[in-house]
Amino acid sequence: MARLMGVDLPRDKRMEIALTYIYGIGRTRSQEILEATGISRDMRTKDLTDDQVTQLRDYIEGNLKVEGDLRREVQADIRRKIEIGCYQGLRHRRGLPVRGQRTKTNARTRKGPKRTIAGKKKAR
């Protein structure tokens, strides 16, 4: 099993898919990495040589922000928005959707489970 950036890549998947197991790498970025390193998209992870693994590791470390570094950067961006008091920061602080989605209905993922309000009855 190849290990890149602290993530074990699945052995039997194609490299194009296996690289997406790393936080910060999606399909498009995965294809760019493989093209830059000259590794076939259809190659399976178990067929990689040590040189190819090293080549992938060097490329990712040198050119991309992934895993822990990227997570820290995203958290820092959210903290900064909260501190400066911008609209997005306020939405983060209140636990509401940040990007303009409706909240009269839906938004349950962001708001959490429903809280019943005492004394409020349904109109007939």
Swiss-Prot record:
Subunit structure as annotated in this protein's UniProt entry: Part of the 30S ribosomal subunit. Forms a loose heterodimer with protein S19. Forms two bridges to the 50S subunit in the 70S ribosome.
Role noted for this protein: Located at the top of the head of the 30S subunit, it contacts several helices of the 16S rRNA. In the 70S ribosome it contacts the 23S rRNA (bridge B1a) and protein L5 of the 50S subunit (bridge B1b), connecting the 2 subunits; these bridges are implicated in subunit movement. Contacts the tRNAs in the A and P-sites.
PANTHER family named in the record: 30S RIBOSOMAL PROTEIN S13/40S RIBOSOMAL PROTEIN S18, SMALL RIBOSOMAL SUBUNIT PROTEIN US13M
One GO BP annotation of this record: translation
GO cellular component: cytosol; small ribosomal subunit
Protein's gene: rpsM
Protein known as: Small ribosomal subunit protein uS13
SUPFAM superfamilies: S13-like H2TH domain
Lineage: Bacteria, Bacillati, Actinomycetota, Actinomycetes, Mycobacteriales
Chain spans, region Disordered: 94-124
Keyword Ribosomal protein listed: yes
This protein's record includes keyword Protein biosynthesis: no
A single MF term (Gene Ontology): structural constituent of ribosome
Pfam families per the UniProt record, alphabetical: Ribosomal_S13 (PF00416)
Record organism: Mycolicibacterium vanbaalenii (strain DSM 7251 / JCM 13017 / BCRC 16820 / KCTC 9966 / NRRL B-24157 / PYR-1)
Similarity-based family: Belongs to the universal ribosomal protein uS13 family.
UniProtKB keywords: Ribonucleoprotein, Ribosomal protein, RNA-binding, rRNA-binding, tRNA-binding
Coiled-coil intervals: none
